[in-house]
């Protein structure tokens, strides 16, 4: 409308000048039809035409500037997209077009007859500052190369209210130990061998409107059984929280505050960043991560505040129920947080820290602290080369438990040493414009007390039952556990939404831990009493100590059954992963 009115005003003025300017000439000739025009009148017509031509140029210029301003002020279609527009100052416009800055040599232009109010309105609109949209945090570079980030760059369908997300993850494992019960232990990603399995089918996405936000992602498949199994907190108190939460990997809601570069406050179930690797295998450089990732939390239940002081820095404190816990295992919540910094497009620095939590079920005075620190560097980037990118990630973890009969340093007064030290290093290569990927890496841990070792599911053992007793793989204070692993991963990525992956892994522990040929399932299946020893006849011994179990099994003409645990494991896993 403003454009239309401005055009109408200018054209009305131009027409008025064109009609009225010759009137004095007609007045002079009205006395006699044969009177000839004077020399002065003959010169007036070219001057008027020159002024009208200058005014026409001026109008065209203003119309073009209004159109450019309107385009620049149009909202961006995608979050993080910035359309920078800087209006020309009046002096700049005049310098660019000398004819419009001085419509007549004398400076006494008929353009001065334009209404001052109209000129002021036009100038005000033209010189009003245009504030570019603020950059979204971490949006000014391509971070799809990071380990733990999805590589999808385009969304097929998006709205102002909802951004959908769909994930599917299927795998097949060949375990060279060939367990007769097909059961794999010591992993939070692989659980069965010689079978095709659905790891996760996730449907959900992000809801966002008027600064209110929410996210939902489901986890149908193996994750819905295996992830809750590693949480001891449901053993504290009543209500079947595992059934309530098992099919949800993320579910939270919150609000976005437009301060600094953004502040988000969310509450619910959200993913943990400890261990660098994403909970979703599609996002990672490898399928089976090393111990400092696989043995640390995948989710938290609580409240987080994401503070973005700059576009390259995030400070995120957590108030959570505990260490990968739906409930609180004792009487005190956990506190923690993350600092993420990306000073350059080729480097990512992350520090995660956790403390205060009391996460050992039935041991209320034992406290846990942990730090997890990572750096990722893209040190080679030539998109047109056959080998187009190279990057590495290095993660180091340290932590301990103290109180309740254990200590961080193993002194006599505090009890046996209960600590965690570990690292992992991966190097990633991309080929042929990211059509192929190759990752080599591995890691090592030392975890006396075994409080972060993934408990083998012997006879259906879970984190809850192990808090009472785990007869076949103990987790007593000071129990040793040292392990290392290595892997090589090859990816074929024909589209940004799918990955075909082949991976070889070798893992070693200093104690029998991995499933061997004989399996980890009792002869007649799980007895329903994982805290008790099992007899070879397939029945439970009713005893939690080995001498009592031997006596009980002998009484029925049997012996004590033991799982087949090995110090070494190697396997090949093949997977198809999809993300929209």
Task: Enumerate the language-model features and the residues they cover.
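Hydrophobic, lipid-facing positions within transmembrane beta-strands of outer-membrane proteins
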Residues: 148, 162, 198-203, 246-253, ...
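Surface-exposed coil loops of outer-membrane beta-barrel proteins
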Residues: 143, 177-193, 225-252, 258-341, ...
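Short loop/turn motifs that connect adjacent beta-strands in outer-membrane beta-barrel proteins
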Residues: 149-164, 177, 210-214, 258-263, ...
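Outer-membrane beta-barrel pore domains and translocons
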Residues: 169-173, 219-221, 268-272, 320-323, ...
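Outer-membrane beta-barrel pore domains
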Residues: 190, 227, 236-241, 347-355, ...
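N-terminal periplasmic/intermembrane-space "pro-region" immediately following the signal or transit peptide
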Residues: 26-181, 471, 580
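Glycine- and aromatic-enriched membrane insertion/assembly motifs of diderm outer-membrane
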Residues: 161-172, 184-224
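Residue-level signature of outer-membrane beta-barrel architecture
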Residues: 157, 170, 205-209, 255-257, ...
């Amino acid at each position: 409308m403003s454009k239309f009115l401005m055009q109408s005003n200018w054209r009305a003025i131009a027409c008025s000048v064109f009609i009225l300017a010759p009137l004095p000439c007609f007045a002079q000739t009205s006395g006699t039809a044969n009177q000839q025009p004077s020399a002065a009148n003959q010169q007036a017509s070219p001057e008027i035409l020159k002024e009208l031509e200058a005014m026409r140029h001026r109008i065209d210029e203003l119309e073009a500037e209004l159109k450019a301003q309107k385009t620049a002020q149009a909202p961006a279609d995608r979050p993080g997209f910035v359309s920078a527009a800087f209006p020309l100052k009046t002096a700049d416009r005049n310098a660019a077009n000398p004819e419009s800055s001085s419509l007549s040599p004398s400076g006494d232009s008929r353009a001065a007859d334009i209404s001052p109010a109209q000129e002021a309105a036009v100038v005000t609109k033209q010189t009003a500052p245009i504030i570019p949209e603020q950059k979204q945090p971490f949006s000014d570079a391509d971070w799809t190369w990071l380990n733990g980030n999805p590589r999808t760059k385009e969304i097929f369908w998006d709205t102002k209210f909802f951004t959908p997300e769909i994930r599917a993850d299927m795998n097949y494992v060949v375990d060279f130990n060939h367990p007769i019960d097909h059961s794999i232990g010591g992993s939070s990603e692989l659980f069965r061998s010689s079978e095709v399995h659905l790891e996760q089918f996730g449907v959900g996405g992000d809801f966002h409107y008027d600064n209110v936000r929410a996210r939902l992602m489901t986890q149908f498949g193996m994750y819905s059984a295996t992830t809750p199994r590693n949480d001891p907190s449901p053993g504290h108190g009543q209500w079947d929280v595992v059934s309530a939460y098992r099919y949800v990997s993320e579910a939270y809601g919150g609000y976005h505050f437009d301060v600094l570069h953004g502040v988000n406050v969310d509450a619910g179930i959200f993913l943990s960043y400890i261990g660098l690797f994403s909970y979703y295998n599609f996002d990672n450089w490898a399928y089976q991560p090393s111990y400092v990732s696989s043995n640390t939390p995948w989710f938290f239940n609580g409240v987080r505040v994401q503070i973005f002081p700059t576009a390259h820095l995030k400070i995120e404190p957590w108030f959570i129920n505990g260490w990968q816990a739906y409930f609180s295992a004792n009487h005190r919540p956990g506190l923690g947080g993350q600092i993420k910094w990306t000073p350059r497009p080729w480097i990512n620095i992350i520090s995660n820290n956790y403390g205060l939590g009391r996460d050992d079920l039935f041991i209320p005075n034992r406290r846990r602290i942990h730090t997890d620190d990572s750096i990722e560097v893209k040190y080679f980037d030539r998109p047109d080369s056959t080998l187009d990118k190279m990057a590495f990630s290095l993660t180091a973890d340290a932590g301990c438990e103290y109180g309740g009969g254990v200590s961080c340093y193993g002194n006599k007064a505090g009890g046996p040493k209960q600590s965690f030290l570990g690292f992992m290093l991966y190097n990633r290569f991309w080929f042929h414009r990211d059509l192929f990927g190759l990752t080599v890496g591995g890691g090592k841990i030392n975890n006396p007390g075994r409080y972060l070792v993934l408990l083998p599911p012997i006879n259906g053992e879970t984190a809850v039952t192990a808090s009472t007793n785990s007869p076949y793989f103990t987790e007593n204070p000071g129990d040793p556990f040292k392990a290392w692993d290595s892997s090589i991963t090859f990816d074929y990525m024909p589209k940004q939404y799918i990955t075909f992956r082949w991976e070889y892994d070798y893992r070693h522990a200093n104690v029998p831990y991995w499933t061997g040929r004989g399996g980890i399932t009792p002869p007649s299946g799980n007895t329903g009493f994982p805290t008790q020893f099992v007899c070879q006849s397939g029945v439970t011994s009713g005893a939690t100590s080995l001498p009592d179990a031997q006596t009980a099994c002998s009484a029925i003409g049997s012996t004590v059954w033991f799982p087949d645990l090995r110090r070494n494991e190697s396997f090949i896993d093949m997977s198809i992963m999809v993300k929209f």
